[in-house]
Regions:
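Interdomain hinge/linker segments and adjacent boundary elements that couple functional modules
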Residues: 2-8, 22-26, 40, 44-175, ...
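Alpha-helix N-cap/helix-initiation motif
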Residues: 3, 16-17, 180
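Short, amphipathic alpha-helical "recognition" segments used to contact nucleic acids or chromatin
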Residues: 10-14
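Short alpha-helical DNA-recognition segment
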Residues: 17-36
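A ubiquitous short alpha-helical element
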Residues: 34-39, 238, 242
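C-terminal regulatory/effector modules of DNA-binding transcriptional regulators
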Residues: 161, 168, 174-281
Length: 281
């Protein structure tokens, strides 16, 4: 997050100065690719590079330059501190998502066919990990690591800095028997417990709501406490996960989420539906 803030500020300064990535790269004897990575916050940044770019972009405010250098220092320190998620067997994109989730203050998630990962029981998560076409893991030890990582993510729900979670789930996700009836009953019981947390809002979009705006697939919106931090959207496609970090598009996803939530049952009614489905299974 710190790297993204710093990179975003450098991008803003370059745009304001009407400079190209090629020109910026020449100033610090780098490639265009490095400038792209810097502006997206993907790499740690050296103080000499930041000073040179600020001078090139015409930033003469010494205090502003000092603030950027401090952001760079904090970002470098954070990168050195190994996060608990870095031992994850997940693919790189998912590991990156877990790191972002750990830094977030609020999560809004829409799920079509699965219970959100933050709400899953170990049994449900394990069943997903071994399901053909869902989990790529075959080694039992690796499967348990996947489950452990998912459970560790849930510490944010009740930890020192509780994560605010607003989840909207299609009714299909509650009726799909992942792992069998016993596992699914346990999962629905877990949802009923989680719905009682003050920092969790859970709504179900019922079948009888008919067509809805979010037919294209699941997505999650991550929000951060940092000033002027743009929401980050992670959306799943057939082949990969797509990241959205620009204000216009992330705002569009936020509007899409809100419209779907308005068509969903209120939390109290959602809890009643979950209980009814649990009794049916």
């Amino acid at each position: 997050v710190l790297g993204r803030r710093l990179g975003g500020e450098l991008l803003r300064l370059r745009d304001a100065a009407a400079k190209t990535q090629q020109q910026a790269a020449e100033v610090i004897s780098a490639t265009n690719s490095k400038i792209v990575k810097m502006e997206r916050g993907w790499v740690p940044m050296r103080d000499p590079d930041i000073r040179a770019l600020c001078e090139f972009y015409g930033l003469v405010d010494g205090k502003a330059v000092t603030q950027l250098l401090e952001l760079a220092r904090l970002d470098r320190e954070r990168r050195k501190a190994k996060g608990w998620w870095q031992d994850s067997p997940h693919p790189g994109a998912l590991t990156e998502y877990i790191a972002m989730e750990d830094a977030a203050s609020r999560v809004r998630t829409w799920q079509l066919s699965l219970v959100p990962g933050l709400f899953q029981t170990p049994e449900y998560a394990r069943a997903l990990a071994v399901s053909e076409g869902v989990g790529p893991w075959e080694d039992p030890a690796e499967i348990e690591r996947v489950v452990d990582i998912r459970m560790r993510r849930q510490d944010r729900l009740t930890g020192e800095r509780p994560l605010k979670v607003y989840a909207v789930v299609w009714e299909a996700a509650l009726r799909q028997l992942i792992g069998g009836s016993v596992t699914m009953r346990g999962q629905l019981e877990r949802l009923l417990e989680i719905a009682g947390l003050e920092n969790v809002r859970l709504q179900v979009l019922p079948f009888h709501a008919g067509g809805h705006p979010c037919v294209t697939g699941p997505f999650t919106i991550l929000s951060f406490n940092e000033d002027e931090a743009v929401d980050v959207v992670q959306a799943d496609t057939i082949a990969s996960s797509v990241w959205v970090e620009n204000e216009v598009t992330s705002s569009a996803y936020g509007d899409l989420f809100d419209r779907t939530a308005r068509r969903s049952l209120a939390q109290r009614d959602s809890v009643q539906l979950i209980e009814a489905i649990r009794q049916e299974i």
